[in-house]
Each structure stands twice: as C-alpha cells, then as structure tokens.
Amino acid sequence: MDKYPFLREAGSSFKDRDVTKMSDLIATWDGQDIKGPALIGVPLSKSSISHSGASFAPGTIRQALKHSSAYSAELGEHVVSELLYDLGDIDIHVTDIVKSHHHIFQTMHALLSDHPDWVPLILGGDNSISYSTIKAIAQTKGTTAVIQFDAHHDVRNTEDGGPTNGTPFRRLLDEEIIEGQHLIQLGIREFSNSQAYEAYAKKHNVNIHTMDMIREKGLIPTIKEILPVVQDKTDFIFISVDMDVLDQSHAPGCPAIGPGGLYTDELLEAVKYIAQQPNVAGIEIVEVDPTLDFRDMTSRAAAHVLLHALKGMKLSPFK
C-alpha cells in the first residue's frame, strides 16, 4: 500500500510514534506456556438478579485498556515488560447458568493446572462467576485468601433463585472451598444488605469492613492491619473487585449502584498495594454493565484497576 500513503485501515485512530498504547502490548495467546499475568474474559450476565448487560463488559474493558498508555510515571517505564497475552473468552451456554458455571470452572481449572505460573486477569461478567473462578484457584493453588471489594456480602440463599450474582460467597463458604476467616470484605455499604446475611457472614467469621469503618480508619491502613493475619494462614491471595464498591458518581455503569462508596483513587491504590504482596493468584473484575454506563466511565475505571494491579505486581519485591 506504499503507493497510497494516505490510505489507512478503516476505523484506525491517530498514531503517535512516541506513544506506546496497551494495544501495542496486548497480543492474542499463541498457546504457549503462560508465565505471569494474562487476560481472560467471562461474559456471563444471565445469573444477575436484576437487569444486567455485564456480558458486554469484557469487550468494553478490553477497549478501555487498549486505549490506555502503557507508560507508568511511578514506574518510569511501561507497566508490562513483555507482551500481555489475551486468552479470549470462556464459552457461556445460551440458557443454562449451571452449565455456564461449569464451563468457567472447567476452563480455569485446566488452564491453571497446565500453566501454574499464570496470574489470571479475569474480566467479568456478573459476580456469580466468582464461585467458579475462586473454586478453580483454590483447587489448583491451595489455601486461598480472598480480598473482596464489594458493597454487598453476596451470601444470599440459593433457595429463592438458584445460583445468582448474589450467592457466590455463600456457595464458597457452604461448600468449604474457602474459610470465612480467609475472606476479607471491604466496602460493605449501609442499606445494601440484610440482617440475616450480615449474621451469616459473622457466623462464618468473615472479616467485614464497612464503609463507615473504612472512612474512620482509612482503606490502606485497614488492609495493612488485616492482610498479614490472613497471609499467615493461607498460601495465595485472590482479589475480587465488584465495581459497585465504588460510589455511584464514580461507577454509574453497575447494576447495583448506590451512594457512599469508595472513590476510584482509593480503589486503585488499594489494588496496587495488594498486588505487591507475595503469592497473588489473580484478580477478577465483575458487575460492569456497559448498557448503563456514561461515556464508558465504569469500563475505564475497571481498566485502570487492571493497570494498577499490573503496576503493583511490577513494584513487588517478591516477583
């Protein structure tokens, strides 16, 4: 095409020779051994108890990630040293939620077994996927601590609606896949949960940190206080980020938005801090609904959560 120097690929954006975007560093997985972080999408939203277009989120988060600069001023270099592979999306059954959860577990378990050095960056999807992702992590890695950023406990009973985006941690605790004392819930909000589910979480010794508690003590000090306690009892840490932990002004594209949540910068700093810890097994982002979003604000915030996780991993003295 040298004969037509001003003709370019349809839809292509402005290209600055001095800027490296994440799109320049993200590549389709070639089937080779995976070492370190790599992306995988889980486009499930049928299990949401409210209207949800979270199945579209892996695509919009990817786009927001690709449009971001790869350069971190804090690092003084790109946030990834080599290519960041994208494994694609896990196939979701058209109508069967239970079968979809099995697809997720089976795929994650097989990949983690075959690639023990893989650190999954999971793009949900509604929060129901956490049952399958964390189950796969726990069965392949060992005793796992879960840091759950969420406005809700997500321990609803399964009798009233089956496996939904409100039940993943109930199922994980009931089936003893994780222990309550190894689950840290950060950002639990007022008027977003029931007394029965708070009682269930407390009965199982879940580490609950409400927004009121976080506002009084600070998010990072809270994490610094509780994290060593669970690290001493577990082999790995998994980070689960429900984007509705953010205040509705920061994340309008969530099915269950509400006031009084975390600010984006607080979440980013917290994820970066946790990602610097030893034996981080991965991170998932759930409950982004692009159909409700404004100018992709929530997908952009989710992409920055991933970027700060990558930055934390690169800053880690344990890598």
Curated annotation (Swiss-Prot):
Pathway: Amino-acid degradation; L-histidine degradation into L-glutamate; L-glutamate from N-formimidoyl-L-glutamate (hydrolase route): step 1/1. This is Formimidoylglutamase. Keywords: Histidine metabolism, Hydrolase, Manganese, Metal-binding. One of its GO terms (molecular function) is agmatinase activity. Pfam families: Arginase. It comes from Bacillus subtilis (strain 168). Gene3D superfamilies: Ureohydrolase domain (3.40.800.10). It catalyses: N-formimidoyl-L-glutamate + H2O = formamide + L-glutamate. Mn(2+) 1 binds at residues 127, 150, 154, 242. Belongs to the arginase family. Its cofactor is Mn(2+). Binds 2 manganese ions per subunit. Can also use other divalent cation, with lower efficiency. Mn(2+) 2 binds at residues 150, 152, 242, 244.
